[in-house]
Amino acid sequence: MSAPGGGRSGPAEWGGFEDNMQGGGSAVIDMENMDDTSGSSFEDMGEMHQRMKEEEEEEAEGEAGAGGEEDGEFLGMKGLQGQLGRQVADQMWQVGKRQASKAFSLYANIDILRPYFDVEPVQVRTRLLESMVPVKMINFPQKIAGELYGPLMLVFTLVAILLHGMKTSDTIIREGTLMGTAIGTCFGYWLGVSSFIYFLAYLCNAQITMVQMLSLLGYGLFGHCITLLVTYNIHFHSLFYIFWLVVGGLSTLRMVAVLVSRTVGHTQRLILCGTLAALHMLFLLYLHFAYHKVVEGILDTLEGPNMPPFQRVARDIPVVSNAVLNTTAKANAMTL
């Protein structure tokens, strides 16, 4: 009896259990109805981790940027120093280049002057002789040698002749002063008068260049050299005047003839040739007279005025009586 009852109670109990399970006390976990807090916490942790990672990356990028800026500043300083170094090197290069160009230009200028001194000694001798022979040719311009070797040597020769005149006249003076005066006188006349006559020739429309004028006046000093060399060794004023008129006159006429052939117009010829002839002849007179007066004045200043030689003057001796002389003689004899 008990068994069926027990059998009845068993299914009923199991049925109640089933009902309870189907009711609110079901043992099956409904994942859909569960709270999602655990999953959200995991997601929050992931987001926090991601944010921390991003912050670390940003900090790393910031540090890298700061380091890059520092490196950029350092590289900028190095670049500035390198730029300054390049500028200094460029300036040094430019200075050296300018000095080299100046040296090259100086050599080039010397090379430009070389044709004016490229002449044979035979040609110089021929031109020296021609400078003493006037040629009467007015219709055509006479040829002028465009070289400066002969005129320059004549100027130095004139300087040497002036110094020789000082030595032969027993002139005692400091060599520097004497040499400077002679060189200044000769070169001053050659360059100064050549420039002045060239200016007059330009005003008078004469066909002549500066180099030709220097050559013409330089070879014209050959007569001055001959005249002064002879008259310094033979001291006669009459001989000087003869050489002044003949030798100096021939060299002056040669230059006048050349300028006449290269100038158009009687008035222009008279002004130009008259000025040149007057200056050339007066310069020879100056070298013979005034130059020595200057030196004599210097000598008087250095040595002082000449003192007259010592001369003996006769004096009157008073007359002594014979008694005094006899007494003196006796006294001398007794002492002996």
Curated annotation (Swiss-Prot):
An example GO BP is:
cell differentiation
Looking at the UniProt entry, the stretches that span the membrane are 144-164, 183-203, 210-230, 240-260, 270-290
Please verify whether the record's keywords include Secreted.
no
| One cellular component (GO) term of this entry | plasma membrane
Membrane topology per the entry is:
Multi-pass membrane protein
Where in the cell does this protein reside?
Cell membrane; Golgi apparatus, cis-Golgi network membrane; Cytoplasm
Write out the entry's keywords from A to Z. Cell membrane, Cytoplasm, Differentiation, Glycoprotein, Golgi apparatus, Membrane, Transmembrane, Transmembrane helix
Q: Which residues lie on this side of the membrane: Cytoplasmic?
A: 1-143, 204-209, 261-269
**Chain intervals with Acidic residues compositional bias:** 55-73
Do the record's keywords include Transmembrane helix? yes
- Side of membrane Lumenal, spans: 165-182, 231-239, 291-336
The residues that the database entry marks as glycosylated are N326
Ranges for the region named Disordered are 1-73
Which PANTHER family does this one have? NATURAL KILLER CELL-SPECIFIC ANTIGEN KLIP1 (PTHR15627), PROTEIN YIPF3 (PTHR15627:SF14)
Q: What does this protein do?
A: Involved in the maintenance of the Golgi structure. May play a role in hematopoiesis.
State the similarity comment.
Belongs to the YIP1 family.
The protein's name is Protein YIPF3
Which organism does this record belong to? Answer: Gallus gallus
Q: What is the lineage of its organism?
A: Eukaryota, Metazoa, Chordata, Craniata, Vertebrata
